[in-house]
């Protein structure tokens, strides 16, 4: 049976890729053979993640971005297409750690701050 989740040689963009969630996803997908593109505001951290992936034999690149700036995102898209020729997947991990938009182990989804959750949701959709 074919592997239904094969990401080998797929170009995967991760917004917020320098964050905790984005970094974890990037590392795993790189181990599975994906070509990782980290988009984030934190250049130093993003470049370190790329270096870590490359040190393990993976392929990755970093592009400085701001997910709230459409012009920068359009330029990111052009640069990524120029480098890789295609985009196979986009994972939006930006904004996920905003205070109030997450809950602890002793809370339920009903304890979420709805305004903070909406802000994170809007960032992810942009």
Model-based region annotation:
Residues 125-126:
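Conserved small/polar residues in nucleotide/adenosyl-binding loops
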Residues 14-27, 45, 62-68, 86, ...:
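A structural preference for long, well-packed, hydrophobic secondary-structure segments
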């Amino acid at each position: 049976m074919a592997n239904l989740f094969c990401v080998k040689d797929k170009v995967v963009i991760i917004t917020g890729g320098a964050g905790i969630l984005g970094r974890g996803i990037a590392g795993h997908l790189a181990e599975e053979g994906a070509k990782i593109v980290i988009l984030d505001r934190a250049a130093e951290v993003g470049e370190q993640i790329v270096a870590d992936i490359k040190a393990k034999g993976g392929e990755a690149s970093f592009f400085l971005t701001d997910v709230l700036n459409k012009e920068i995102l359009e330029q990111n898209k052009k640069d990524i297409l120029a480098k890789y020729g295609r985009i196979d997947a986009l994972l939006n991990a930006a904004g996920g750690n905003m205070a109030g938009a997450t809950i602890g182990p002793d809370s339920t989804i009903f304890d979420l701050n709805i305004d903070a959750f909406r802000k994170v949701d809007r960032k992810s959709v942009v």
